[in-house]
A protein has these predicted regions:
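Canonical Rossmann dinucleotide-binding motif of NAD(H)/NADP(H)-dependent dehydrogenases/reductases
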Residues: 2-34
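Conserved glycine-rich Rossmann-like NAD(P)H-binding loop of the short-chain dehydrogenase/reductase
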Residues: 29-46
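Substrate-binding pocket helix/loop in short-chain dehydrogenase/reductase
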Residues: 99-100, 107-112, 194, 205
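C-terminal substrate-recognition "lid" of short-chain dehydrogenase/reductases
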Residues: 120-123, 179, 213-242
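Active-site helix of classical SDR
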Residues: 123, 159, 167
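Alpha-helical segment proximal to the catalytic Tyr-Lys
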Residues: 128, 172-176, 233
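Residue(s) in the substrate-gating loop at a strand-loop-helix junction
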Residues: 143
């Protein structure tokens, strides 16, 4: 019997990286997985196969998380397909870095839409289902950049700070309905995206980390499992940093 046996989890942006690691971790603990991405390409199809290997129900959905209407439709379909929505992980995210004075309105708007508005969209669509169930766990993927800020990432920092504020507010609004909301703030995590950085940049990052190394997607997935499961039944409105001590 796994920690999440019989539960249904929605994980956004789960075709690769941290989202994929979370979906696989949940599946290993018995959760049925509905994951979304802008398109379900070869990466998404491979993710679906890897999750299915755990013997759970899984389906990938192509959806624009930044669209309120698209999100409402996909959550309705997921509820029909799976019968419940017990866990929501808002992981969809992009970066469009640049110094503030050189940043275009389009760069700002795109990051806020995908990183922050998408979380509002999914929470708004999933909350009525969770309220009827009288239970649910919402996990927002934030970042240490949302806690400390970072030069050249004002749009990303603002979106991730917003994810923290959103989780804390939802925790207060929905706690009486048995719904918990928390945020995870990863630090430097080794993914396909960060693997493209130069050795010099990665070495500089490691110098700033007390543990002197980057984290893995599995490090983040372990915390997500804790927050999704009954192990954290009295934890809500919190931000857990997974950053090696930064």
């Amino acid at each position: 019997m796994g920690l999440l046996t019989g539960k249904t989890a929605i994980v956004t942006g789960a075709a690769r990286g941290i989202g994929k690691a979370i979906a696989l971790k949940f599946a290993a603990e018995g959760a049925n997985i509905a994951f979304t991405d802008l398109v379900i390409d070869e990466n998404g199809q491979n993710t679906e196969k890897e999750i299915a290997a755990y013997g759970v129900k899984v389906k990938g959905y192509a959806s624009n998380a930044a669209s309120f209407e698209d999100t409402a439709k996909v959550v309705e379909q997921i509820h029909k397909d799976f019968g419940s929505v017990d866990i929501l992980v808002n992981n969809a995210g992009i970066t469009k870095d640049g110094l503030m004075m050189r940043m275009s309105e389009g760069q700002w708007d795109a990051v806020i839409a995908v990183n922050l508005k998408s979380a509002f969209n999914f929470i708004h669509a999933c909350t009525p289902i969770m309220m009827r169930q009288k239970q649910g766990s919402i996990i927002n993927m934030a970042s240490v950049v949302g806690v400390h800020g970072n030069a050249g990432q004002c749009n990303y920092s603002a979106s991730k700070a917003g994810m923290i504020g959103l989780a804390k507010s939802i925790a207060q609004e929905l706690g009486s309905r048995g719904i918990r909301a928390n945020a995870i703030a990863p630090g430097f995590i080794i993914t396909e995206m960060t693997a493209k950085l130069s050795d010099e940049v990665k070495a500089e990052w490691n110098k700033r980390i007390p543990l002197r190394r980057g984290g893995t997607p599995e490090d983040v997935a372990n915390i997500a499992l804790f927050l999704a499961s009954d192990m954290s039944s009295y934890v809500s409105g919190q931000v857990i940093q997974v950053d090696g001590g930064m």
